């Protein structure tokens, strides 16, 4: 496990990994930054059953998701799931990563800006995914103030969040308090309600215009997704392993559900 020292190293490692495996690397110039948003697309090597996107590095002080996606690319971890196509976004906030801050270099929290195109990094990502049709996505984050994992997980199969948390628990601790980031949480899962209630709640939250990335993707029609929150108060290697475990369990559940449908 090796944490990238800066965004330039992330770019170099992503470029090298993509070239070594013949993956499709797309660069999206970010206005005013002289930097590119990176996207790596990995086609399914067998008959495709699903498309999964993974987003990391929205906040520059949350390194485990970035390490996770770099390992995913460098270690060719997608090969364990040959029927799934992946779209990987290694770091959404280049200047925040270099500064080690939640916000970008202008002090803006990108994860409150996805309702509009005002912030260059957000505008670039919105355009990059506007025409995609992911079956599900992982918005990988960390909670720097926690000692246990939790997730905001929204799936048509209500058993999936619990199963994902169980897989993560094999790698590290799960949150034990009744609240996470001022939201009720039970067994590592932030309360979500049934599908009708969830949609109503989402629309209420979205009314204030301070959208995190999942709200934008929800508005595009993607209904199955999770935000992972690894605990920033424990060692990095464990947090990275927990991120891998959450992603892998989701992929396995997705494949199994598609196989059952055929």
Each language-model region and where it sits:
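Structured catalytic-domain cores with a bias toward divalent-metal coordination
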Residues: 1-262
């Amino acid at each position: 496990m090796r944490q990238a020292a800066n965004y330039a190293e992330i770019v170099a490692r992503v470029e090298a990994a993509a070239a070594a495996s013949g993956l499709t690397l797309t660069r999206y110039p970010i206005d005013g930054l002289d930097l590119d948003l990176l996207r790596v697309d990995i086609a399914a090597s067998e008959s495709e059953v699903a498309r999964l996107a993974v987003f990391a590095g929205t906040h520059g002080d949350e390194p485990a998701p970035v390490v996770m996606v770099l390992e995913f690319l460098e270690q060719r971890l997608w090969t364990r799931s040959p029927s799934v196509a992946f779209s990987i976004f290694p770091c959404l906030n280049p200047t925040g990563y270099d500064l080690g801050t939640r916000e970008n270099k202008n002090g803006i929290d990108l994860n409150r800006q996805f309702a509009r195109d005002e912030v260059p990094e957000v505008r670039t990502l919105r355009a990059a995914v506007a025409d995609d049709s992911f079956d599900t996505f992982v918005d990988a984050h960390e909670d720097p103030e926690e000692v246990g994992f939790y997730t905001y997980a929204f799936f048509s199969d209500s058993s999936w969040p619990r199963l994902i948390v169980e897989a993560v628990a094999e790698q590290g601790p799960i949150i034990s308090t009744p609240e996470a980031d001022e939201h009720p949480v039970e067994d590592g899962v932030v309360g979500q309600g049934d599908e009708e209630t969830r949609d109503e709640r989402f629309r209420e939250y979205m009314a204030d215009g301070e959208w995190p990335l999942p709200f934008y993707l929800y508005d595009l029609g993607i209904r199955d997704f999770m935000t992972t929150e690894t605990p920033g108060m424990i060692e990095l290697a464990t947090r990275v392993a927990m991120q891998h475990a959450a992603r892998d369990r989701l992929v396995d559940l997705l494949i199994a559900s598609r196989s059952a449908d055929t």
